[in-house]
């Protein structure tokens, strides 16, 4: 758009603009005036553009030009090295590094559309435009450096050597870059690639990333709140994390941490213990003071749990010749041609420092490979050579932390399969028989039942707010009890169907003590430390750990099953109090006791000590990981000087 300088247009401050000054218009190249060229170079700081009638542009520079071909490069600034800016990003993939194409399978109504992701054919995943891709510092390009792990990049940057004027410019930048990379390494993120998408980071990794940023900011007088920052962190690295939290305190800030990790609890200046239990039985400060004061307080559940040695599960032996699931040549991501042996019918823990390849080995290679062998629906497994010994296995599944439902209609009682049984209990009551109610009357998910017609059995109403989050309020007709008045009039032990949905799992165990099929999954849920969950709590409000424990309870009480199942769990201790970890280990042991195989990714010392077989990956994270450093019974691993071996030795008092 050409405008006159006498009446320039108003430009948005937040938008990016390219502004060129027109020096002259010429009919043909031979008519170029020397004075116009000199004027353009003067106003353009040594650069000028030539635009043809077709709209194509060519840049000419007196400072950044190739003497052989004449190709000119504009003056570079940091924006050129960002794939989020117009000049820096690759035009083909718009800075994503990948191309997305739709593929159709089938025809008509049965057609399914898949989005296929492939590497960008122009930048080959670098995400940058040709000019920034060509710039090198000490022989390395920008996208090559950001493709390294934090530890590798730190080592590379420290090796840079500059001289003369370049050293004067580079020195302060390199010092700050090294400082920030060291902060990332110190909080246990040395294995992360610098260009890794933030959306793929775990909650613990994201917290530690923010912590590293705060360490670099050097603020004083701030209040920092962290929720379980040790999630995903190997015990070996907890000390470094605590050291960095202490640095924030030394700077004059206050650090408030919600945490179950024993080392973090003992390192605190002031400890607040809430309880005495969870849910309705919690919410009270039962003890506070120094860790020593709280841990010697008999009223403190945390103090009681730490005052005694945990009761370790009796490990099952793995004799020579025991049936094994053998995976060889796993080489996905950072795995280095890994071979593992998984004893069937045993409790196996896969441990290792953060980024050593645990999740890649178990969730991206082993589980999909087994499911593929069993002809079950699965993602394509990661690279491996062979898989043997799957014959006894009939099922393979991951008991993960994904949501079990996304609406108020899905509740723990329906997920565990006990609401149908409870409906029959109500239908068998004298009041229900007099009124002619059958079990369907007590369903809040069917229109023909006795559900509240105002909220359709959801117990709440959602109000859409323009430009604001939706507001959820209790239904004014049923008061959140999901049923209409006549249905609520039917009672069992003085409780209506709505009252039963408001019970916690612990309370429901005593109410339905004469109904074993109802009590069994609820008791298992209590054993898993989730007895505070109410039967009618919306599944979409459950945390990942709570959803995982509900899935475990459902699997353990699914009835008689003669199918050997391979279960995979990823850090099931997340969010668990130290007193509940012991319960978890014994409940997991029940799966093994009935003949199933359990593979758990975990580095909680108590869980590792309670396993039958331990596989340790390492020795470090990222490129320095991906190898088997120890494999065998926990007592054997504890004798090795590996990261996990040292922790296990202390836990098992060897």
Residues covered by each model-derived region:
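Conserved phosphate-binding elements of NTP-dependent enzyme cores
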Residues: 1-654
């Amino acid at each position: 758009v050409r405008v006159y300088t006498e009446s320039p247009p108003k430009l948005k401050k937040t938008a990016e603009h390219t502004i060129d000054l027109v020096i002259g218009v010429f009919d043909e190249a031979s008519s170029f005036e020397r004075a116009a060229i000199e004027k353009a170079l003067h106003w353009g700081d040594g650069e000028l553009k030539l635009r043809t009638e077709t709209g194509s542009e060519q840049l000419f520079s007196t400072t950044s030009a190739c003497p052989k071909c004449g190709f000119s490069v504009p003056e570079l600034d940091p924006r050129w090295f960002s794939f989020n800016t117009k000049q820096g990003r690759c035009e083909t993939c718009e800075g994503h590094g990948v191309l997305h194409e739709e593929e159709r399978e089938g025809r008509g109504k049965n057609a399914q559309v898949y989005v296929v992701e492939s590497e960008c054919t122009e930048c080959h995943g670098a995400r940058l435009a040709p000019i920034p891709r060509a710039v090198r510092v000490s022989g390395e390009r920008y996208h090559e450096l950001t493709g390294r792990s934090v530890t590798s990049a730190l080592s590379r940057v420290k090796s840079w050597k500059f001289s003369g004027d370049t050293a004067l410019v580079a020195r302060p930048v390199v010092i700050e870059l090294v400082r920030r990379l060291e902060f990332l390494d110190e909080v246990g993120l040395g294995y992360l690639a610098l260009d890794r998408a933030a959306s793929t980071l775990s909650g613990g990794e994201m917290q530690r990333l923010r912590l590293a940023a705060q360490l670099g900011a050097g603020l004083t007088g701030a209040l920092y709140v962290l929720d379980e920052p040790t999630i995903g962190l190997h015990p070996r690295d907890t000390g470094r994390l605590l050291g960095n939290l202490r640095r924030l305190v030394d700077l004059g800030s206050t650090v408030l941490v919600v945490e179950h990790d024993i080392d973090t609890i003992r390192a605190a200046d002031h400890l607040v213990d809430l309880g005495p239990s969870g849910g309705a039985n919690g919410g009270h400060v039962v003890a506070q003071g120094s860790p020593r004061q709280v841990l010697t307080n008999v009223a403190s559940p945390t103090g009681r749990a730490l005052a005694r040695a945990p009761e370790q599960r009796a490990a099952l032996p793995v004799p020579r010749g025991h049936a094994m699931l053998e995976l060889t040549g796993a080489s996905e991501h950072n795995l280095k041609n890994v071979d593992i042996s998984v004893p069937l019918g045993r409790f196996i823990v896969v441990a290792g420092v953060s980024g050593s390849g645990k999740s890649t080995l178990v969730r991206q290679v082993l589980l999909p490979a087994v499911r593929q062998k069993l002809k079950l629906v699965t993602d394509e497994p990661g690279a491996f050579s062979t898989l043997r010994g799957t014959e006894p296995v009939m099922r393979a599944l991951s008991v993960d932390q994904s949501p079990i439902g996304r609406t108020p209609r899905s509740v723990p009682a329906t997920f565990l399969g006990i609401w149908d049984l409870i409906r029959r209990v109500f239908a068998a009551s004298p009041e229900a028989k007099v009124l002619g109610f059958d079990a369907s009357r007590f369903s809040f998910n069917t229109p023909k039942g006795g559900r509240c017609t105002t909220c359709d059995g959801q117990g709440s109403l959602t109000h859409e707010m323009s430009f604001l989050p939706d507001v959820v309020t209790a239904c004014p007709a049923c008061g959140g009890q999901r049923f209409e008045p006549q249905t609520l009039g039917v009672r069992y032990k003085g409780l209506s169907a709505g009252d039963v949905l408001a019970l916690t799992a612990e309370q429901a165990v005593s109410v339905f003590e004469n109904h074993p099929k109802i009590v069994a999954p609820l008791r298992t849920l209590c054993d898993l430390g989730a007895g505070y969950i109410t039967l009618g709590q919306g599944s979409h409000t459950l945390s990942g750990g709570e959803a995982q424990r509900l899935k475990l309870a459902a699997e353990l009480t699914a009835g008689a099953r003669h199918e050997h199942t391979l279960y995979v769990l990823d850090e099931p201790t997340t969010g668990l109090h130290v007193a509940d970890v012991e319960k978890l280990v014994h409940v997991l042991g029940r799966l093994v006791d009935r003949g199933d195989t359990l593979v758990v990714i975990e580095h909680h010392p108590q869980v590792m000590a309670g396993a039958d077989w331990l596989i340790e990956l390492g020795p470090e994270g990222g490129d320095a990981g991906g190898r088997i450093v120890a494999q065998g019974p926990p007592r054997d691993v504890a004798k090795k000087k590996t990261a996990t071996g040292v922790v296990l030795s202390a836990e098992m008092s060897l």
